[in-house]
């Protein structure tokens, strides 16, 4: 079972929040847990975004302090990217997700330059970011703050089915 590996920079109250949120995440992605590994989490005081995932080091930076609801959403969002980068089977879901979101099938899944530098309104158009925000809604039941990302009921069904290794809608 994959684990979160917590850096010494992570305070005790944040550790508790991370562990509880990880349990929620694994409850949804349990059927896929064998295709992604551990992830390291480092707490930082300054970061342009709330959180950032680096697939080359399998490390997530999280800006603290922050409200618990925002931290939970940021954790789940970046863990969704972790699954996306580590789980080869993730590609099985992409066309169904693009269809569910009403996007052309030839839409690039990710921005070639990454997405952290993009304006918020452009960031929300990237399928990979729509997927990650949809995962937030699936795992946490909703999104605790507004983003420009459009989530569809069909997208929620696709992500949920894929996470549980059920037939895609």
Model segments located where?
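Post-signal peptide N-terminal regions of Sec-secreted extracellular proteins
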Residues: 2, 55-56, 66-69, 155-158, ...
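Auxiliary, metal-adjacent structural segments of Zn-dependent hydrolase domains
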Residues: 2-58
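Soluble non-cytosolic domains of exported or imported proteins
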Residues: 11-20, 65-74, 122-126, 130
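Structured segments of extracytoplasmic/periplasmic soluble domains
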Residues: 24, 28, 32, 78, ...
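Surface-exposed patches in mature extracellular/periplasmic domains of secreted proteins
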Residues: 30-42, 91-94, 143-151
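Active-site scaffold of zinc-dependent metalloenzymes
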Residues: 38-73, 79-86
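Acidic, glycine-rich loop-and-strand cores that form catalytic or ligand-binding grooves
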Residues: 76-105
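Metalloprotease/metallohydrolase-associated module, dominated by Zn2+-dependent proteases
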Residues: 99-169
């Amino acid at each position: 079972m994959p684990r979160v590996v917590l850096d010494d920079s992570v305070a005790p109250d944040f550790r508790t929040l991370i562990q509880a949120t990880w349990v929620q995440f694994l409850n949804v992605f349990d059927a896929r847990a064998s295709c992604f590994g551990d992830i390291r989490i480092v707490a930082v005081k300054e970061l342009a975004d709330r959180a950032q995932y680096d697939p080359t080091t399998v490390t997530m930076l999280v800006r603290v302090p922050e409200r618990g609801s925002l931290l939970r959403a940021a954790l789940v969002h970046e863990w969704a990217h972790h699954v996306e980068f580590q789980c080869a089977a993730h590609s099985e879901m992409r066309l169904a997700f693009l269809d569910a979101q009403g996007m052309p099938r030839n839409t690039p899944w990710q921005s070639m330059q990454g997405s952290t530098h993009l304006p918020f309104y452009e960031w929300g158009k990237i399928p990979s970011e729509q997927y990650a925000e949809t995962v937030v809604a699936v795992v946490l039941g909703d999104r605790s703050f507004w983003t420009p990302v459009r989530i569809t009921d069909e997208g929620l069904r696709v992500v949920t089915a894929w996470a549980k290794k059920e037939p895609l809608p």
